[in-house]
Design a protein with these regions (language model features):
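N-terminal Rossmann-like NAD(P) cofactor-binding subdomain of oxidoreductases
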Residues: 2-199, 323-329
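A generic structural signal for well-ordered coil/turn residues at beta-strand boundaries
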Residues: 62, 128, 202, 239-241, ...
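Short clusters of hydrophobic/aromatic residues that line enzyme substrate/ligand-binding pockets
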Residues: 66, 132-134, 147, 189, ...
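Short glycine/proline-enriched loop/turn "hinge" motifs that connect secondary-structure elements
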Residues: 87, 236, 300-302
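Hydrophobic alpha-helical scaffolding
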Residues: 151-152, 206-208, 313
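C-terminal active-site/capping subdomain that shapes the small-molecule cofactor and substrate pocket
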Residues: 230, 242, 246-330
Length: 330
């Protein structure tokens, strides 16, 4: 069977880490990269990563290729996706990782260029996009849609947790706080930004801001729609984040009962997606962990039908691993 042919549009943090995952898979091949940055810089950033370490391959670049251990990957710098040679290159799936082309019409520029399918590495904007969180609404990945979204890193952590709790106890309502590593959508030093809190120095401040995870989880797990609100707290770590979810359940429970449900899920239908931990974790402990969420059983608290759970996630490694899985398997 022929390998699935993949192109990546946008070779930033998620694009490069997803490339690393795909490169180790047998049934796919990344044949093209499109990014406005010069190829020498892209090759260097693919090889060396401050958070995730060295990509142990011989990597070189030329005017129109990046070569990894002798295998050439076409590399271009085209601003208009409709002008990319996806038909000529027989591209099966484009990973849209620029963060720019997030509507269905924008993503379909890749379809117009000859690709069969597009997966957006961010929450989609507007209608006509099938959002998938593996382990939660995996069946939707097999739909006839041509434009998909891998949701967000926080939604990929939150949705499996919500699904376990709701199926076991029923969720009436709740609140989410994600304590999140800083990202490129913040300023290193105080500088203008449309969000005045994100305008402040990322490595120096605790920064309250917004997250769309509470709304997004309702798209992939409809029973929870309109039952959660959320806030994000950006903190000065390079990667490694956590969610604290507080919910009112429809029936009373206990710490042991809650933890048992998550342990069961981690060993069965959410294996590889959700990890069950009994260790006293801190954020650096989960850097490089490819699970969507790492359930911290020691942090569970219950007061009647008020339940608090905590789950960790490497907002880069976990998310890019699921993105690679989605692209490779569906």
């Amino acid at each position: 069977m022929a390998k699935k042919r993949i192109a990546i549009n946008g070779f930033g943090r998620i694009g490069r880490l997803t490339f690393r995952n795909l490169w180790e898979m047998d049934d796919v091949e990344v044949v093209a990269i499109n990014d406005l940055t010069d190829n020498a810089t892209l090759a260097h950033l693919l090889k060396f990563d401050s958070a995730h370490g060295k990509f142990n391959h011989d990597i070189t670049s030329s005017e129109d290729h990046i070569t990894i251990s002798g295998t050439k990957v076409a590399a271009s710098s085209e601003r208009d996706p409709s002008k990319l040679p996806w038909g000529e290159m027989k591209i099966d799936t484009v990973i849209e990782a620029t963060g720019v082309f997030r509507t269905a019409d924008q993503a379909k520029l890749h379809i117009n260029a000859g690709a069969k399918k597009v997966v957006i590495s961010a929450p989609g904007k507007g209608a006509g996009i099938t959002t998938v969180v593996l382990g939660v609404n995996t069946d939707d990945a097999s739909s006839d849609s041509t434009v998909f979204s891998n949701a967000s890193c926080t939604t990929n952590c939150l949705a499996p947790v919500v699904k376990v709790l709701d199926e076991a106890f029923g969720i009436d309502k709740g609140s989410l706080t994600t304590t999140h590593a800083y990202t490129s959508d913040q300023r290193i030093q105080d500088a203008p930004h449309s969000d005045l809190r994100r305008a402040r120095a990322a490595a120096y401040n605790i920064i309250p801001t917004t997250t769309g995870a509470a709304a997004a989880v309702g798209k992939v797990y409809p029973p929870i729609k309109d039952k959660l609100f959320a806030i994000a707290i950006r903190v000065p770590v390079i990667t490694g984040s956590m969610i604290e979810l507080n919910v009112i359940t429809n029936k009373e429970t206990s710490i042991d009962e809650v933890n048992a449900k998550f342990k069961e899920a981690a060993g069965s239908h959410l294996k590889g997606i959700l990890e069950y931990s009994t260790d006293p974790l801190v954020s650096s402990d989960i850097i490089g962990n490819k699970h969507s969420c790492i359930f911290d059983s020691d942090m569970t608290n219950v007061l009647g039908n008020l339940v608090k759970v905590v789950a960790w996630y490497d907002n880069e490694a976990g998310y890019s691993a699921r993105l690679a899985d989605l692209v490779a398997q569906y």
